[in-house]
From Swiss-Prot:
Protein name (Swiss-Prot/TrEMBL): Small ribosomal subunit protein uS5
Upper classification of the organism: Bacteria, Bacillati, Bacillota, Bacilli, Lactobacillales
InterPro entries for this protein: Ribosomal_Su5_D2-typ_SF, Ribosomal_uS5, Ribosomal_uS5_bac-type, Ribosomal_uS5_C, Ribosomal_uS5_N, Ribosomal_uS5_N_CS, Ribsml_uS5_D2-typ_fold_subgr
Pfam families: Ribosomal_S5, Ribosomal_S5_C
Annotated PROSITE patterns: RIBOSOMAL_S5 (PS00585), S5_DSRBD (PS50881)
Subunit field text: Part of the 30S ribosomal subunit. Contacts proteins S4 and S8.
Organism: Lactococcus lactis subsp. cremoris (strain SK11)
Keywords noted in UniProt: Ribonucleoprotein, Ribosomal protein, RNA-binding, rRNA-binding
HAMAP family, sorted: Ribosomal_uS5_B (MF_01307_B)
GO molecular function, a single term: structural constituent of ribosome
Amino acid sequence: MAENRRNDREQSEFEERVVSINRVTKVVKGGRRLRFAALVVVGDRNGRVGFGTGKAQEVPEAIRKAIEAAKKNLITVPMVGATLPHEALGVFGGGKILLKPAVEGAGVAAGGAVRAVLELAGVADVTSKSLGSNTPINVVRATVDGLTQLKRAEEVAALRGKSVSDFA
């Protein structure tokens, strides 16, 4: 009973977005085996976001597995208001994503998989450019890589042993 309540609370805490569903085949002696691979992004629109992949013979089961994997793979995104603290370049495989902070009210200028990650992270004002590969999994991983590189001014000041006012 308590397990169900915890799962219900988790359900309401995170929003999920299916980025891609891919039909994959494995050739065996008797023919082809069909499976589905799902890529899902989850986030609370408050600075926490994660992604996961799942594979199964049915689409709903693949999505469920991907959601579980995404919830185990959450990162926290440092934000300044509704935008990013500074520019970042995320790289994964052939995918490169350039993330730039934008002025308040600019909105999310990003496409496809990048938009899903940024919106579910709660970033409201950002500009992005996808360079290189446009494969959804590489784009999502590169975006998450870019978000993990972000640091607040306070963190940088502490690392350098200076005060925040020295950076102004």
